[in-house]
Amino acid sequence: MADAETFAFQAEINQLLSLIINTFYSNKEIFLRELISNSSDALDKIRFESLTDKSKLDGQPELFIHIIPDKTNNTLTIIDSGIGMTKADLVNNLGTIARSGTKEFMEALAAGADVSMIGQFGVGFYSAYLVADKVVVTTKHNDDEQYVWESQAGGSFTVTRDTSGEALGRGTKMVLYLKEDQMEYIEERRLKDLVKKHSEFISYPISLWIEKTIEKEISDDEEEEEKKDEEGKVEEVDEEKEKEEKKKKKIKEVSHEWDLVNKQKPIWMRKPEEINKEEYAAFYKSLSNDWEEHLAVKHFSVEGQLEFKAILFVPKRAPFDLFDTKKKPNNIKLYVRRVFIMDNCEDIIPEYLGFVKGIVDSEDLPLNISRETLQQNKILKVIRKNLVKKCLELFFEIAENKEDYNKFYEAFSKNLKLGIHEDSQNRTKIAELLRYHSTKSGDELTSLKDYVTRMKEGQNDIFYITGESKKAVENSPFLEKLKKKGIEVLYMVDAIDEYAIGQLKEFEGKKLVSATKEGLKLDETEDEKKKKEELKEKFEGLCKVIKDVLGDKVEKVIVSDRVVDSPCCLVTGEYGWTANMERIMKAQALRDSSMGGYMSSKKTMEINPENSIMDELRKRADADKNDKSVKDLVLLLFETALLTSGFSLDEPNTFGSRIHRMLKLGLSIDDDDVVEADADMPPLEDDADAEGSKMEEVD
């Protein structure tokens, strides 16, 4: 062998290894699933490359996974004829470059997650150290020579060019030197059970090197020959007698052979009624690397002009990187006539359904399809349309069980709202799946459909309020009149609600109306209308004074018919941003600031004529519109209204000073008196004297 090069593990990987080695995990068996899954991925890659270039398979035409237990040396070997690794791949992928999931996986482990999640974070290879204290990887890639990677996980690993080992042709061979207490993993029965449990549905043959003992019957002719030689004489015997006396002898002969473990045909080729829940769960786990079972499954086939079979799964919880834009989703595996084509096919399902896992096997797509031609492919567009339809059907099936749907909605509500924003064709269908808290729903969530059935007589619109949290909006001044009239209001407190509701203008013919925007119209009796007109007239002067004081801060000041208890509130234009949307946009680091100028619409101040503060303010303003206290109070009211209406203050310090001034007034403290009192006090001669005099006073 050539000289070995030594490399240090990247710090995070080193941490991960010490965590895997030094912590007790009960389900160490998952290591085999992870290593077989890696082999399957490597085989997928070479098979895909060979579709366009057959010569890629010359080094090793067969595609397989072999498992060899060795009781003599206490090793377990896993060999695949996959794509193999170059020297650079070995160094980077197995030690020096941490994947994005390394840190997240360690954090998840620290938070009590199961070690079997390791595959979801892309660091499944290191699970080998759950059962082995030394791992040797020999690999051959078509573009490089054969190399050996070796490590006992002590902070470093070596890579050596393999000049003397057995030539692989192409692929990877992993030898695990098992720990003394992990010898169960060289037992044939145990290995077979593990492959059946976790890797039954891998689409390549997984063969186990098994020991076979055969009993052979042999006649004892040879023994007789030996005896004759020893005695040196031949006894004459009757032939018949000789035949009778000839005995048959049994001997045990040991042989080895490959035994195919995953004999099942692809699960999606079988009829749904023939498959039980456990089989679906096993297939889901092998497909997704999830340690939990799925929440729901949809197994269907489409026939006619276009033929394909598919199985779709909804997980129980959202993955840690659900909305990671850098990560390509690889949740739907695409097969063509049972041949795996690709697993991060972005065009097969819209982004908002990126959490759905599964497989699609098409009869019509060409085998040599590439990503570039896939985008233009009409067949794929039809498959995509069908998948979206079936996903939505599946969600409605989940919704039939309230408990399951609550789990689903908690994990994936953002995806549904993203669907409202992006998928105009299915918008009305997705809207039926939305759930919100409301002024009448208590701790339960309500659907838009249920809201419509509870609407009051004569109510034509669906009312909602957006905000930062349920707590922030449930006592909002915007809801006062609506609550008084017994009208239900939906709380939309997810940041993405603002975007979704911008697209969902109505539901079942009922317009969605924001309680925080101008133009809120509620049914009024003749008496109410008359009273409103009188109050408008009465408060006209105050409205003008407030507008003069606030200037450009507000567009107009009007008498409100939406606030009942609060003195005032600030509403936004019907087509501009709400206060909540303004908050969201300000929080975006890469926002287009020019857009904020025209989208954050001018505010309208609505005053409550029946509030005692407003009534007193009106009297003062009518008496003297230049009264300084009126100006101060108007500014204070405006700033508090900004806060209660969900806006942020541009000058919090000024607001703080105003509050302090009001506190002093309330406590009858005069600033001038405080200054004078300080001036009258004689300077202290000495600290010690001061302390002494204090002591004398106590005496």
UniProtKB/Swiss-Prot annotation:
Cellular component per GO, a single term: plasma membrane
Organ and tissue specificity: Present in all tissues. Most abundantly expressed in roots and floral bud clusters followed by flowers, young fruits and rosette leaves.
Motif (TPR repeat-binding): 695-699
Keyword Cell wall biogenesis/degradation: no
Gene3D superfamilies linked to this entry: 3.30.230.80, 3.40.50.11260, Heat shock protein 90, C-terminal domain, Histidine kinase-like ATPase, C-terminal domain
Binding-site list for ATP: 34, 38, 80, 85, 93, 99-101, 120-125, 172, 371
Inducing or repressing factors: In contrast to other major heat shock proteins, this one is also expressed at normal growth temperatures. Levels increase only slightly after heat shock and also increase after salt treatment.
Keywords: ATP-binding, Chaperone, Cytoplasm, Immunity, Innate immunity, Nucleotide-binding, Phosphoprotein, Plant defense, Stress response
Region (Disordered): 219-248, 676-699
Ranges annotated as biased composition (Acidic residues): 219-228, 676-690
Short name of any one Pfam family annotated for the protein: HATPase_c_3
Statement: the UniProt record of this protein carries the keyword GTP-binding: no
GO term, biological process aspect, one: chaperone-mediated protein complex assembly
SUPFAM superfamilies: ATPase domain of HSP90 chaperone/DNA topoisomerase II/histidine kinase (SSF55874), HSP90 C-terminal domain (SSF110942), Ribosomal protein S5 domain 2-like (SSF54211)
Coiled-coil blocks: none
InterPro entries: HATPase_C_sf (IPR036890), Heat_shock_protein_90_CS (IPR019805), HSP90_C (IPR037196), Hsp90_fam (IPR001404), Hsp90_N (IPR020575), Ribosomal_Su5_D2-typ_SF (IPR020568)
GO molecular function annotation: ATP binding; ATP hydrolysis activity; ATP-dependent protein folding chaperone; mRNA binding; unfolded protein binding
Localization annotation: Cytoplasm
Residues recorded as bearing Phosphoserine in the entry: 219
Domain statement: The TPR repeat-binding motif mediates interaction with TPR repeat-containing proteins.
HAMAP family in the cross-refs: HSP90
Family, per entry: Belongs to the heat shock protein 90 family.
Function: Functions as a holding molecular chaperone (holdase) which stabilizes unfolding protein intermediates and rapidly releases them in an active form once stress has abated. Functions as a folding molecular chaperone (foldase) that assists the non-covalent folding of proteins in an ATP-dependent manner. Regulates RPP4-mediated temperature-dependent cell death and defense responses. May assist SGT1B in the formation of SCF E3 ubiquitin ligase complexes that target the immune receptors SNC1, RPS2 and RPS4 for degradation, to regulate receptor levels and avoid autoimmunity.
Subunit (UniProt): Homodimer. Interacts with OEP61, OEP64 and OM64. Interacts with SNC1.
PANTHER family xref list: HEAT SHOCK PROTEIN 90 FAMILY MEMBER (PTHR11528)
Record protein name field: Heat shock protein 90-3
